[in-house]
Structure formats: C-alpha cells, structure tokens
C-alpha cells in the first residue's frame, strides 16, 4: 500500500504540473489510492499544510540550500517542503522520521542522486532548531514571507485592518478550518444529531444565534459516512454561511429567487426555514453546478426548489419569475474570507482576477433589483474581506437606485451577544468570530 507521505508528494506534484485545485487533486488521489482513516488525515494535513505555508517553506529552502530555489528541480522542492513542514509545524512527527522519509521519497521518485541534498537541508534545519536558532530573521523577512501570503494581499489587509489585525487574521488563516453542520429540522433535531455523533466519540457544540447550527469536533473520517448524512438529517455549512438565509428571513408561501444558487447550501437553507412551503427559484449560469444542488435537494427531501439555468446579466435572458418577495444574491467573489478552507486561493487570486469580478457583481445587482416587489428584501453576500467587493458595491448600488435602502437587522456573535447592525451591512471576521470571513448586506425596496 502507498504511504501517506508518498501520496502527499504525488498530489503536490499533480497540483504543480496540472495546476489542479488542492481539494480536487486530493479527492482524485484518494479515490485511486484509498488510505486508512489516520493515513488519510495525515496525507490531507501534509498537502494542505504545504500549500498554505508554501512561501515560508520556500524562504527556508533559500536559506538552507546551496542553489537558488528557481534552479532546483520542482520535485526536489516538493520533497523538501514536505520535510520542512513536518519539522516546523507538526510536533507529533519525530524529527528523525521527517528527515528519513524525505530521503526515502527522493530515492523512490527518481531523485536518488539528490537524496543527500534533501538529507543535508533537513538536517541543517533540525540542528538549527535544536540550537534554538531561527533561520528566518524576523527583522529581514516580510510579513508575507512570515505568514505565507502574497505581498499584494498583505497590503490589502493592512490597508483595511491595520498591521496587528492583519497578523492575527493571517495566523488564523494558517489553521485548519472548523467543521459546521446545519441540521434539517424537517427530518430531525439538533439534539438527535448530537446524540448520534456522540456515539462515535465526536463532540458537538450548539452555535449561538443559529438554531440549526452544530460545530463538530474530533476525528470525523469521511463526512459522507457519518450517521444522518445519507438520510438528509444535516448538511455541511459554515456558521457564517448559515447567517445569510437567516438574515434574508424567508416566510412560508413566499416567492424567493436565489440568483447564484449552486451548489445549493443557502438555497436548501431557505427551503428549510420556509418549512418547504413556497416557491424558491434557484438560478445559476453553470448547469454542472446546479446538478450538485439537485443532488443535495433530493438528499434533504426538499420539494419547493425549482432549478433554473441562466445568466441574468446577459441581454435578452428571461428570468424564471416576474416578481419575488425576497432575493438572495450570493455573488461570485474572490473568496478571501475562506483562505483557511481554500489555501490555494491565496496563490490563485490577484488584483487582476478580482478586477474582473467587480463589474459582474455590479451587473447582477442591477439585474435583480427590478424583480423584487415593492417592500421586498434583497440580501447581498460574499465570502470575501475585500471592501471593493463588499461595502463599495452596496454604496454604489444605493447611489444608483433611490428606491432602495439599507435595512438594519440583528446578529448574534459566537460569544452569544446579540447586536443591532444599524448600517444593514455586516462583516464577519474569522479571527474574531472563529468562522469564515463573510460580508452580508440587507437591503429593502421602497
């Protein structure tokens, strides 16, 4: 059987050679090479960890190696990154194991002649650690190198939150994400789900302000194998995302339009909040993503959702409904609030890619506005912490649409404190609230 470290190396090589998304590459490899649950967790930790800490690890390699990193074979770099990640960040791995398995990986993957290079760099780092020396001089390296983020992103965060907040935020983004469930009240209760998971020695915590929310702790294994998944008792959804439908506050028998609905987490939440009574139109321009929504809808036993494939921003496209009571616009965004959950986003997004999202977000706001009834509600949400995609978009929309205004709402923090969001715009900060970074705006039509 293939080892967890060997599979982690193959996945990292796949990501490098094919520009694969991390989660896709991991799923593909684990389907081909099934591992035991502990090895599966270790392999996943190694891959996500190396992708997250890539820039910091490369700084270490520059200090430890005799050749510039750009002149080293990519496969050698991956093997050394794996070894350094274990030495620097995984206390449970003995240093000797991290070094010796790194040498073994080099020999097993066509780099036998460079195995001494791997051994030399890893042992050099190990000796420095044992002597209490910090190879990375905190005064000489940038914050981006220290926390493993691109400089442009650090500058964006510093301009928005300041240096101290940025360091706390980036430290949070380098941790493993929490796992939150949303209980389906049409089939079960939070207590029943918690009891079924407790039998597997999994801990659960009810989340303040979220009647359907349950935070899961412990070694879960494959999510789809947990009790209640196949039965539609629950679905995975971060606490921040659960707030979106709650703020929309849909009522039974209303007509709702979820404009960018796939893969369906918020759509199905809307249906649950309405008791599956009403008309919910779930739109998306990608049919393959809507197929995922259909699967989730069926698993949860919901019948009030009607799927519509289309793009409201395109000329001549007829919407699936003329007027709605409420609309949800969870726009395509840069995802900068989920960098702990999607570590490769920090390397994929650039100021240029974000610039292409801004006109799309504006066009979607403009397209949905006429479809909401007078007195109706529009909730705009993103999972980013970029003000240009958040507050700036809402301020521009309100300037251009005098018949719309921000609507205050109440929000309960994870600490259980309920506050009135008088501006109608909420930013959830990961390092303060221990959940995904989100922006939610509540808008009311005159």
UniProtKB/Swiss-Prot annotation:
Main location: cytoplasm
Subcellular locations according to the entry: Cytoplasm
One GO process term, biological-process aspect: regulation of DNA-templated transcription
Documented EC number(s): 2.1.1.176
Gene Ontology CC entries for this record: cytoplasm
Keywords recorded for this protein, A-Z: Cytoplasm, Methyltransferase, Ribosome biogenesis, RNA-binding, rRNA processing, S-adenosyl-L-methionine, Transferase
Binding residue positions for S-adenosyl-L-methionine: 260-266, 284, 311, 330
InterPro entries tied to this protein: MeTrfase_RsmB-F_NOP2_cat, MeTrfase_RsmB-F_NOP2_dom, NusB-like_sf, NusB_RsmB_TIM44, RCMT, rRNA_ssu_MeTfrase_B, RsmB-like_ferredoxin, RsmB-like_N
Family membership noted in the UniProt record: Belongs to the class I-like SAM-binding methyltransferase superfamily. RsmB/NOP family.
Xref: PANTHER family: NOP2 YEAST -RELATED NOL1/NOP2/FMU SUN DOMAIN-CONTAINING (PTHR22807), RIBOSOMAL RNA SMALL SUBUNIT METHYLTRANSFERASE B-RELATED (PTHR22807:SF53)
Protein name: Probable ribosomal RNA small subunit methyltransferase B
Organism name: Synechocystis sp. (strain ATCC 27184 / PCC 6803 / Kazusa)
Lineage of the species this protein comes from: Bacteria, Bacillati, Cyanobacteriota, Cyanophyceae, Synechococcales
Gene: rsmB
């Amino acid at each position: 059987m293939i080892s967890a470290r060997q599979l982690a190396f193959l996945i990292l090589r796949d990501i490098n050679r094919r520009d694969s998304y991390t989660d896709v590459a991991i799923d593909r490899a684990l389907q081909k090479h099934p591992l035991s649950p502990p090895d599966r967790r270790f392999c996943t930790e190694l891959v996500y960890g190396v992708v997250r800490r890539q820039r910091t690890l490369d700084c270490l390699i520059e200090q430890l190696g005799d050749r510039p990193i750009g002149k080293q074979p990519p496969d050698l770099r991956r093997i050394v990154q794996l070894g350094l990640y274990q030495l620097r960040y995984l206390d449970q791995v003995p240093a000797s194991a991290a070094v010796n398995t790194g040498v073994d990986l080099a020999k097993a993957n066509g780099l036998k002649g460079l195995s001494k290079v791997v051994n030399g760099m890893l042992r050099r780092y190990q000796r420095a650690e044992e002597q209490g020396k910090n190879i990375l001089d905190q005064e000489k390296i940038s914050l981006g190198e220290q926390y493993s983020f691109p400089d442009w992103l650090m500058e964006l965060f510093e301009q928005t939150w300041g240096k101290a907040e940025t360091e706390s935020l980036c430290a949070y983004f380098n941790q493993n994400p929490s796992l939150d469930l949303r209980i389906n009240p049409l089939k079960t209760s939070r207590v029943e789900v918690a009891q079924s998971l407790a039998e597997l020695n999994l801990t659960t915590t009810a989340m303040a302000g979220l009647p359907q929310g349950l935070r899961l702790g412990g070694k879960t294994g494959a999510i789809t194998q947990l009790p209640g998944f196949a039965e539609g008792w629950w679905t995975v959804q971060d606490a921040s995302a659960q707030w979106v439908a709650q703020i929309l506050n849909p009522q039974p028998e209303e007509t709702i339009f979820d404009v960018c609905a796939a893969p369906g987490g918020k759509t199905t939440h809307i249906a649950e909040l309405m008791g599956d009574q009403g008309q919910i139109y779930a739109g998306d321009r990608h049919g393959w993503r809507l197929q995922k929504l259909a699967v989730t809808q069926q698993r949860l036993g919901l019948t009030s959702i009607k799927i519509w494939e289309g793009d409201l921003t395109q000329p001549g496209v007829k919407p699936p409904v003329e007027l709605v009571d409420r609309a949800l616009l969870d726009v395509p965004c840069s995802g900068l609030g989920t960098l702990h959950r999607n570590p490769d986003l920090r390397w994929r997004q650039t100021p240029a890619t974000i610039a292409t999202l801004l006109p799309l977000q504006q066009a979607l706001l403009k397209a949905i506005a006429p479809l909401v009834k007078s007195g109706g509600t529009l909730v705009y949400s993103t999972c980013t912490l970029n003000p240009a995609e958040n507050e700036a978009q809402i301020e521009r929309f309100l300037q251009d649409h005098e018949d719309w205004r921000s609507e205050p709402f109440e929000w309960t923090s994870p600490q259980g404190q309920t506050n009135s969001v008088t501006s109608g715009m909420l930013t959830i900060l990961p390092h303060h609230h221990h959940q995904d970074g989100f922006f939610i705006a509540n808008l009311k039509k005159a």
